[in-house]
Structure formats: structure tokens, C-alpha cells
């Protein structure tokens, strides 16, 4: 009996071992399929297809930049893998890369449309935009699509704009015609309208806002869509592992406030547009900036600041006019007060080199003076506000924000609190009293815009149009200073 029991146990063990070996062999022969997310992690690389534009991805002298790049870089970091950005020449190539498996996702300022949604998965949108019909000042402004004649309208092929026009033609404008360019990008289409090679095009609202800074005559005629969302696109497969991770990523970005910070950094300074001001800026880039650029660069290197930011400050202060004088007595390119100039060791505020180096030194001191827990880019914007309104008033606004339960290290919060310094119910609570708090808000916004323009103008490899040529005007000559000519000096202090 005992022998039989032993034999039964031995047989059971043998059968179990045989079954285990058979299962192991089957698993080795036909392993479980690896998910897309697991494949990315195993590869150690996230492949992202994009396009080059001011709103997506581009190169600067400091490396890669653009909203889509920053979003993709943070997502790759979250996954613990390296980021590989693939650049497509057009929209067709972007979608082909998804279809062929060459890219894991597309981050290219893509709008969700019904037709695209049938072929690809789209994440929750990260930015709202509208589609706008664009024309140039001096050409007829249409009030409706029915006023657009044959040969007057062109858009990018395979774009959401083309999809929207087809929808509108089928619904209410059967006679509407347009051309589709398979090789152009949004900036090229806007340039063609500005250069009067094309009467009309369609652009997303944020792209028009940025490009109007380069081509001030461009205008929105009307919107052809309601609010739409920009999102990432993924191949429409049954495996949603990577897509779900990206969807959670965007949800977390929104909840943490990181997404709004990024959008503010890239688009928060585009709220207002000054047509005359941008024409003047483009003209001064050609005729004034070359005289002083080397001093901006030298001062920037000495004080660890981007020279284009210093130049943007100088333009906001004086339009790069070394003889500038305000009614309050501030003088020179960087518009230094007499007291500030004395503190900085500037003997002659009308000497452009002394003024530029003095302004750089002052801005650098403000950056260093701010509390260490203020991070970039908030730190730079607050230092700019202090440059304009004074460090004490900036700190008053930060204290008010803290008292009211807001984050005093967030520029968006301080931007909303600075104007309170002009209202008695608030400034009586501060150490430094009344200030025209709306002025530093406009001041910072303008400098951010000039800074972005200078970054784009000086971008490596960018196809540049000389400012005078871009405005349809000959660039003004730069008159040389007579050898040894003395610079005008500050008048003696009272």
C-alpha cells in the first residue's frame, strides 16, 4: 500500500514536470506579444515625428526648442528613455511615418478632425485654437467664403484646413474652390500671402499670432471653425499601452499646472499686436541693432545673460537710441537713472557701451537678488518687472499674492497682482506704497515678444529675409561716426 502511494506521488510529480516543461516549450516557441510601451522601454528610445515651425520644433544656438519638443522631452524623461525627434517635410510624411511604424507618435501641432480620428488615436488636447482665413492689408478683406474667387485660396495638403474647407463646401459653399500645396508649411503659406503671391490662406490662430510679428501686414478676415484642440497622434491599433501612458501624462500636466506654464511661456506674450510697432522694430533691427550688437554680446557673456534678452530690454527702453532721454531724466540705450548709473559706475549714460554694460550689470544683480526658489522663466520675467517698477514694488506684489493664498513665485500670479499696487485698498497694505503696476506688466510682455523675435531672427540655418526687404523698404544706411568724435556727456547733477 505504501509502495503504491509512493508510486502515485512520483507519477504525479513526473506528470507535473512534464506539463511544466511542455508549457515552457510552448511559451518559448510562441512568446506573449510585447506591447508598444514595452517595446519603447526595451529600445530605450521614444521616436517622435514632428515638423519645423515656430510653434512646434526648431533649432537655436542653444540647441533644440519649441513647445512640441519640450512636451516630448518631458514625456520621454517620464518613461525613462531617450528622445529621438524625427523631422518630416510635410504632413503627408508625418502620417506616413505613423502608418509605417517609423515613429511611435506624432507631435506636430496636429488638430483632431473626424477624418483623422478614423485613422489615428488622439490624446486629450493640450491647446485650443481656431482656424482663421488670412489676408494681407491692402488686399480685399472678404466677409464670407462666398466672396473668394477661383485661384485666390490655397492651403497645405492633408491639413485640417483642407478637411474643414471640404466640410464647408459640402455643407453650404458648393462653389468654393482652393488649391492644396503638398510641400509648403504654414509659415511658407503665410509668407506667400504677405508677399502677395497668394490672396488668401488658412492658418491656426496661434500660428498667425506668432507670424504676424514677422509679417505685420497679415490679418485675420474671419474664423472658419469653432474652437479645436491640438493633440498628439498615435497609430490606431488595438494596443493602447503607449497611448494610454501619453493620455495620463497630459492629464497630469494639466492637473499639476505644468501645461499652463508651458503655454504661458510660449504664447502668453502674444495677447496684443501693434502693427506700427512691429514695422518700426523690423526697421531698427536692420539699421540700428548692427551698431550695438557686439556690445550686447560682450555684456551678455560677462554677466551670463542671453544677449538677445539684453537687446530686447534695450529696444523696449529706447528703441536702441543712445541719445534717448525721458521726461523723468532717464537716459541712454538702457535708460538708466542718474542714481542707478552712479551705483553701477556708469560715468556717461549716453555712451552706448557704458549704458549697455550698466544695464546688463543691473539686470544681473536683480536676477541674483530674487529669492533662490523662483525658477526660470518666472525669475527672468520678475527681474524684468523689477528693472521697470523697482525691486521694492515687485516684492510688494509678491507679498500681496502670498497673503491672498497664491504662489508668489509664479509670474502669472504676479502679473495679476502688480496692477493692484495702483489701487488704494491694496497699496496701503504694502511697504512701498503706490505704483503704476500695469506698466511692468506691459513692459515684460513687450520684452518677451521682442526677445522671441530676436531669437527667431538669429536662429542658425533660418532662411532670413532682411528686415528692410521684408517690409518692402530699402534698409537705411548706418552712418559711420567721425574718427575720435566725442560722445555727448551727461549734464552735471543738480
From Swiss-Prot:
It catalyses: Exolytic cleavage of the (1->4)-beta-glycosidic linkage between N-acetylmuramic acid (MurNAc) and N-acetylglucosamine (GlcNAc) residues in peptidoglycan, from either the reducing or the non-reducing ends of the peptidoglycan chains, with concomitant formation of a 1,6-anhydrobond in the MurNAc residue. The active site is at residue 317. Residues 271-494 are annotated as: LT domain. Keywords: Cell outer membrane, Cell wall biogenesis/degradation, Lyase, Membrane, Signal. One of its GO terms (molecular function) is peptidoglycan lytic transglycosylase activity. It is a peripheral membrane protein. InterPro entries: Lysozyme-like_dom_sf (IPR023346), MltF (IPR023703), Solute-binding_3/MltF_N (IPR001638), Transglyc_AS (IPR000189), Transglycosylase_SLT_dom_1 (IPR008258). Its main location: membrane. Residues 25-270 are annotated as: Non-LT domain. Residues 474-494 have a biased composition (Pro residues). Gene3D superfamilies: 1.10.530.10, Periplasmic binding protein-like II. The N-terminal domain does not have lytic activity and probably modulates enzymatic activity. The C-terminal domain is the catalytic active domain. HAMAP family: MltF (MF_02016). This is Membrane-bound lytic murein transglycosylase F 1. It comes from Alkalilimnicola ehrlichii (strain ATCC BAA-1101 / DSM 17681 / MLHE-1).
Amino acid at each position: 500500500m505504501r509502495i503504491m502511494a509512493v508510486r502515485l506521488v512520483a507519477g504525479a510529480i513526473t506528470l507535473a514536470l512534464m506539463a511544466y516543461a511542455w508549457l515552457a516549450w510552448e511559451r518559448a516557441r510562441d512568446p506573449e506579444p510585447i506591447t508598444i510601451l514595452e517595446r519603447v522601454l526595451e529600445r530605450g528610445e521614444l521616436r517622435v515625428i514632428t515638423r519645423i515651425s515656430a510653434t512646434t520644433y526648431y533649432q537655436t544656438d542653444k540647441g533644440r526648442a519649441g513647445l512640441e519638443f519640450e512636451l516630448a522631452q518631458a514625456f520621454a524623461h517620464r518613461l525613462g528613455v531617450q528622445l529621438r525627434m524625427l523631422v518630416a517635410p510635410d504632413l503627408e510624411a508625418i502620417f506616413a511615418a505613423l502608418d509605417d511604424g517609423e515613429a511611435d507618435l506624432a507631435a506636430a501641432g496636429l488638430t483632431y478632425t473626424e477624418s483623422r480620428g478614423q485613422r489615428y488615436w488622439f490624446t486629450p488636447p493640450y491647446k485650443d485654437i481656431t482656424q482663421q482665413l488670412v489676408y494681407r492689408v491692402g488686399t480685399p478683406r472678404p466677409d464670407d467664403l462666398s466672396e473668394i474667387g477661383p485661384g485666390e485660396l490655397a492651403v497645405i495638403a492633408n491639413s485640417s484646413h483642407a478637411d474643414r474647407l471640404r466640410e464647408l463646401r459640402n455643407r453650404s459653399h458648393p462653389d468654393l474652390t482652393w488649391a492644396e500645396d503638398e510641400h509648403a508649411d504654414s509659415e511658407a503659406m503665410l509668407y506667400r500671402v504677405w508677399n502677395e503671391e497668394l490672396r488668401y490662406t488658412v492658418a491656426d490662430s496661434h500660428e498667425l499670432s506668432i507670424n504676424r510679428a514677422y509679417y505685420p501686414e497679415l490679418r485675420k478676415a474671419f474664423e472658419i471653425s469653432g474652437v479645436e484642440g491640438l493633440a498628439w497622434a498615435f497609430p490606431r491599433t488595438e494596443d493602447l499601452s503607449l497611448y494610454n501612458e501619453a493620455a495620463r501624462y497630459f492629464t497630469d500636466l494639466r492637473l499639476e499646472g505644468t501645461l499652463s506654464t508651458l503655454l504661458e511661456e510660449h504664447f502668453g506674450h502674444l495677447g496684443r499686436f501693434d502693427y506700427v510697432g512691429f514695422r518700426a522694430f523690423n526697421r531698427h533691427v536692420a539699421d540700428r541693432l548692427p551698431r550695438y550688437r557686439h556690445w550686447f554680446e560682450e555684456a551678455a557673456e560677462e554677466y551670463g545673460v542671453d544677449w538677445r534678452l539684453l537687446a530686447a530690454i534695450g529696444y523696449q527702453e529706447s528703441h536702441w537710441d543712445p541719445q534717448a532721454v525721458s521726461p523723468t531724466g532717464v537716459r541712454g540705450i538702457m535708460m538708466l537713472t542718474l542714481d542707478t548709473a552712479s551705483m553701477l559706475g556708469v560715468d556717461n549714460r549716453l555712451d552706448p557701451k557704458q549704458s549697455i554694460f550698466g544695464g546688463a550689470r543691473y539686470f544681473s544683480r536683480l536676477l541674483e537678488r530674487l529669492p533662490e526658489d523662483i525658477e526660470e522663466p518666472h525669475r527672468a520675467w520678475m527681474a524684468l518687472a523689477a528693472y521697470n517698477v523697482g525691486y521694492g514694488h515687485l516684492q510688494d506684489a509678491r507679498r500681496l499674492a502670498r497673503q491672498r493664498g497664491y504662489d508668489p513665485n509664479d509670474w502669472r500670479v504676479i502679473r495679476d497682482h502688480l496692477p493692484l499696487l495702483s489701487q488704494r485698498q491694496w497699496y496701503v497694505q504694502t511697504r512701498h506704497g503706490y505704483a503704476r503696476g500695469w506698466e511692468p506688466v506691459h513692459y515684460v510682455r513687450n520684452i518677451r515678444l521682442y526677445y522671441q523675435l530676436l531669437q527667431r531672427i538669429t536662429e542658425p540655418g533660418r532662411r532670413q529675409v532682411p528686415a528692410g526687404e521684408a517690409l518692402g523698404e530699402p534698409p537705411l544706411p548706418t552712418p559711420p561716426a567721425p574718427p575720435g568724435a566725442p560722445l555727448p556727456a551727461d549734464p552735471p547733477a543738480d
